[in-house]
Amino acid sequence: MEWSEVEVHTTNEAVEPVANVLTEFGAAGVSIEDVADFLREREDKFGEIYALKREDYPEDGVIIKAYFLKTAEFVEQIPEIEKTLKNLTTFDIPLGKFQFVVNDVDDEEWATAWKKYYHPVQITDRITIVPSWESYTPSANEIIIELDPGMAFGTGTHPTTQLCIRALSDYLQPNDEIIDVGTGSGVLSIASAKLGAKSVLATDLDEIATRAAEENIILNKTEHIITVKQNNLLQDINKTNVDIVVANILAEVILLFPEDVYRALKPGGIFIASGIIEDKAKVVEEALKNAGLVIEKIEQQGDWVAIISKRGVE
């Protein structure tokens, strides 16, 4: 089989939307090469530094690589993929010195190239995300989330995913009921289930994402707790008295439904919102307040922000 590698050079702020667009066009695998990851010298829990070199990363910004089966249909789609990515600027997503390149790769090369950037990521002292192909021995009481990052965005490496998981770890209580809006790979739903949630409703508008989430949920043996639904945000979701709503999506999307979040939450319920770039945090904060939510805490990692708010106790 012949494969094509789509390489996009863009900004860190654009990582999630670009990865989502590439996935929606049918990418079989997506890798994210961010120099910040190298500079952090991420160590695993045994003190080993993964053997990636400085030259594996771009000088600045982020390179996103996606792999597509080279079919006549894909070749015809190439201009549309580039146009869709460039149109992200209409949502105020900065693309930086946007570059879009398509290369041919052989079967063996594509199957391994994107995997070298994914290794176990320790999110908290209790939670570690492990790629499905990695052999990993957990310590006592360690929560392991297995993911196939090739299927949808949400691998655990992005700061917004990590911020959400840490917030879930802080706020989720045993037997809580959770809604995960824009579930992507299902990572936040799986984390919720493994932290003790009684039930989780995972929604995503994208059919590819819901299928990916279902596969990852089965991989983690949490299908008895998590229900996946293809749905636009919280539209037509009649659940109320929910303990936590979590949404790791773009700030512009969060602005569309804070009133729906308020209605879904029980008094005292928590809304964890991330996917918010720093310069848009104030706008989101004001929208949450206007919907009746009370800001509980704001956390930041790099340029990314998570806002934790609460429905007041009436």
UniProtKB/Swiss-Prot annotation:
For S-adenosyl-L-methionine, which residues are the binding ones? T161, G182, D204, N248
| Catalytic activity of the protein | L-lysyl-[protein] + 3 S-adenosyl-L-methionine = N(6),N(6),N(6)-trimethyl-L-lysyl-[protein] + 3 S-adenosyl-L-homocysteine + 3 H(+)
Q: Which domain of life is it from?
A: Bacteria
| Gene Ontology biological process terms, A to Z | methylation
Where is the protein localized?
A: Cytoplasm
EC number(s) recorded for this UniProt protein: 2.1.1.-
Any single GO molecular-function term of the entry would be: protein-lysine N-methyltransferase activity
Q: Name one GO cellular component term.
A: cytoplasm
Enzyme class, top EC level, equals transferase
Principal location listed in the UniProt entry: cytoplasm
Arranged from A to Z, the UniProt key words for this protein are:
Cytoplasm, Methyltransferase, S-adenosyl-L-methionine, Transferase
What InterPro entries does the record tag this protein with? Answer: Ribosomal_L11_MeTrfase_PrmA (IPR050078), Ribosomal_PrmA_MeTrfase (IPR004498), SAM-dependent_MTases_sf (IPR029063)
Q: Does the keyword Kinase apply?
A: no
Q: What protein family does this chain belong to?
A: Belongs to the methyltransferase superfamily. PrmA family.
State the function annotated in the UniProt record: Methylates ribosomal protein L11.
Name of the protein: Ribosomal protein L11 methyltransferase
